[in-house]
């Protein structure tokens, strides 16, 4: 199945701003060499929050391998949706509950490999912990401490739209955990059901197969345009991609070729959560709410559409938002907040800043 490359060249030119060449990784998994050329293999780590046995991650892994990449999977043993960037490690040396869908039995080691593919690993922890297990244990101990060129997380079984869900999602959490380690990363999210890969359809119109191809097309284009650079993406920057309803889950039945466009997280469609009390059950549930803060544009290109609006209303388009792990407020807004704290809070003496020369 051929996928459209509309907007993909733009992805490389806009998101691949010049990397700070003075930065170099200090451990084996931080990116500390140039992006490989065509005559050498690119190493990609795949992770997610829906478990190592989900149809989405297995289809993505297989598709990346078809392209000739050197691919490893380090993913949670069990479903870990909604864990954000939390870092939960195994409490025992064995699996108390087994792995998702019985893909590893109760009592199996808390981390282990697929019996048919030693590049596929599960880990009894959250997504951020699982990908770090790859960086700090599995790759150094069993795979010659190979340098990772890119981490891809997902595709998630559910959209991750807007700034609130960005902090909540385990898929996004694995992405920004990797970015903070100096490893370029992309989070992918779709909207299909939790499906065991062994029971998944092989049809070309199956959503997991379309998501795998669409995600791989974005990865392939990005790596092609990044050849010879110090890093696939600028340090501290990641991509958050949301894929629309496609194939067998698309009500129109027409979307098999989602077209990627640039978006931002905040905007007119962006939402956050609120509590809603149910008088019948006496319990709370969550609902959606918009605020001035979800619409605010403080960083980035304010003329881009927001990802929530694009995915909910634009049809067969994928949203690609460029995100940063530098959470400090922009200079003018930071100065205003600092001014409002005058009289008590002081600035550090000259020479105590975070960057050379401060």
From Swiss-Prot:
Catalytic activity line of the entry: a phosphate monoester + H2O = an alcohol + phosphate
Matches recorded under InterPro entries: SurE, SurE-like_Pase/nucleotidase, SurE-like_sf
Residues bound to Mg(2+): 49-50, 81, 156
One Gene Ontology CC term in the entry: extracellular region
Region of interest: Disordered: 21-41
Chief location category: secreted
UniProt keyword Secreted, yes or no: yes
SUPFAM superfamilies reported for this sequence: SurE-like
Keywords for the protein's UniProt record, in alphabetical order: Glycoprotein, Hydrolase, Magnesium, Metal-binding, Secreted, Signal
Extent of the signal sequence: 1-17
Subcellular location: Secreted
Protein name: Acid phosphatase
Organism: Yarrowia lipolytica (strain CLIB 122 / E 150)
Origin organism lineage: Eukaryota, Fungi, Dikarya, Ascomycota, Saccharomycotina
């Amino acid at each position: 199945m051929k996928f459209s490359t509309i907007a993909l060249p733009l992805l490389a030119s806009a998101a691949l701003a010049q990397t700070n060449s003075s930065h170099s990784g200090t451990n084996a998994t931080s990116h500390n060499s140039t992006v490989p050329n065509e005559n050498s293999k690119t190493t990609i780590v795949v992770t997610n929050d829906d478990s190592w046995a989900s149809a989405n991650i297995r289809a993505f892994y297989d598709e990346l391998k078809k392209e000739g990449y050197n691919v490893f999977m380090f993913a949670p043993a069990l479903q870990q949706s909604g864990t954000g960037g939390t870092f939960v490690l195994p409490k025992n040396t064995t699996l108390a509950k087994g792995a998702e869908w019985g893909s590893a039995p109760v009592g199996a080691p808390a981390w282990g490999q697929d019996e048919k593919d030693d590049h596929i690993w599960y880990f009894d922890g959250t997504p951020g912990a699982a990908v770090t297990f790859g960086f700090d244990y599995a790759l150094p101990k069993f795979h010659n401490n190979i340098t990772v060129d890119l981490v891809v997380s997902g595709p998630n079984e559910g959209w991750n739209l807007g700034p609130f869900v960005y902090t909540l999602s385990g898929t996004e959490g694995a992405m920004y955990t990797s970015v903070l380690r100096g490893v370029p990363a992309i989070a992918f999210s779709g909207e299909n059901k939790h499906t065991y890969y062994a029971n998944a359809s092989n049809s070309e119109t199956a959503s997991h197969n379309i998501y795998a191809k669409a995600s791989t097309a974005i990865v392939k284009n990005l790596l092609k345009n990044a050849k010879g650079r110090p890093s696939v993406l600028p340090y501290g920057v990641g991509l958050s991609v949301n894929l629309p309803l496609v194939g067998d889950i698309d009500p129109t039945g027409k979307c098999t070729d989602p077209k990627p466009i640039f978006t931002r997280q905040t905007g007119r469609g962006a939402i956050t959560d609120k509590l809603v009390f149910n008088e019948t059950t006496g319990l709370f549930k969550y609902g959606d709410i918009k605020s001035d803060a979800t619409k605010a544009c403080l960083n980035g290109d304010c003329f881009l559409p927001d990802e929530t609006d694009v995915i909910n209303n634009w049809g067969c388009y994928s949203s690609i938002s460029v995100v940063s792990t530098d959470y400090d407020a922009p200079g003018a807004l930071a100065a205003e907040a600092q001014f409002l704290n005058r009289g008590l809070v002081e600035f550090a003496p000259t020479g105590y800043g975070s960057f050379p020369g401060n």
